[in-house]
């Protein structure tokens, strides 16, 4: 159908806004995978010790707070107070977006060797992606920790330690590889949840993706885009 507000085709609008949501979700799941796997491994290696308790406390802290609250706090601290990161949009207002190839600014700027646009797109992307990643952080951390503990108790790990292999080699090459299979499954499942849950984050950071599009369409009572995005999700 056609938008009642912009008189633009809904399919055309979805194609225009989808890359922003996809880029945000990919960055968020990458951050969640890195942070969650690291915390899960540390928790397993230091079971029932300070790093274990600390990592679980940190994860619980960030997961317990609503994303919109964390988003505003991060904007105030890292954006306005410290000035480390921008707090809205995908690029600076006066910056021309890189020529579209994939629609992902970070990828397109690299393909065009536009490193200024790449730096700007990464700095704009970091805060919303970090806030969104907290939604998947707990699941990835828990499943990594559980599978690491299970793998550490396997007979082949005990044998490798008995023959004198370095602990770093045992953990990195054998234990983590075995434990990461289940973690990878959880990461793929969380990707869909993050994409569907990006509405609040996109709205607060004024990120021009599907989440912001459906909020603006709802406020305007523009039913065609609402139905289109609902079908897509």
Kindly give the residue locations of the regions a language model identified:
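Short membrane-interfacial helix/loop motifs at transmembrane-helix boundaries
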Residues: 1-12
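Phosphate-coordinating loops and pocket residues in cytosolic domains that bind phosphorylated ligands
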Residues: 5-6, 56, 87, 172, ...
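Residue-level recognition of oxygen-bearing side chains
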Residues: 9, 73, 90, 139, ...
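Residue-level signal for discrete positions within transmembrane alpha-helices
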Residues: 17, 21, 29, 57-64, ...
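Alpha-helical transmembrane segments of integral membrane proteins
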Residues: 18-51, 67, 80, 97-233
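Rossmann-like NAD(P)(H) cofactor-binding subdomain of soluble oxidoreductases
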Residues: 70
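Transmembrane alpha-helix termini and helix-breaking/packing motifs in multi-pass membrane transporters
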Residues: 75-78
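Juxtamembrane non-transmembrane "cap" segments at the membrane-aqueous interface
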Residues: 84-102
């Amino acid at each position: 159908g056609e938008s009642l507000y912009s008189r633009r085709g809904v399919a055309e609008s979805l194609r225009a806004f989808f890359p922003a949501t996809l880029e945000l979700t990919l960055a968020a799941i990458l951050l969640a995978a890195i942070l969650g796997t690291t915390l899960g491994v540390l928790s397993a290696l230091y079971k029932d010790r300070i790093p274990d308790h600390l990592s679980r406390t940190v994860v619980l802290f960030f997961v317990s707070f609503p994303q919109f609250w964390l988003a505003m706090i991060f904007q105030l601290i890292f954006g306005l107070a410290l000035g480390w990161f921008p707090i809205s949009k995908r690029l600076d207002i006066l910056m021309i977006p890189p020529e579209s190839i994939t629609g992902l600014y970070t990828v397109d700027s690299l393909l065009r060797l536009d490193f200024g646009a790449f730096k700007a797109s990464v700095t704009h992307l970091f805060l919303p992606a970090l806030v969104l990643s907290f939604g998947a952080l707990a699941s990835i951390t828990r499943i990594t920790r559980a599978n690491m503990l299970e793998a550490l108790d396997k007979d082949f790990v005990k044998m490798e330690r008995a023959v004198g292999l370095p602990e770093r080699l045992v953990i990195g090459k054998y234990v983590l590889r075995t434990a990461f299979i289940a973690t990878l499954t959880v990461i793929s499942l969380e990707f869909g949840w993050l994409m569907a849950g990006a509405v609040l984050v996109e709205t607060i950071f004024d990120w021009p993706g599907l989440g912001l599009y459906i909020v603006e369409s709802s406020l305007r009572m523009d039913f065609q885009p609402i139905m289109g995005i609902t079908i897509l999700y």
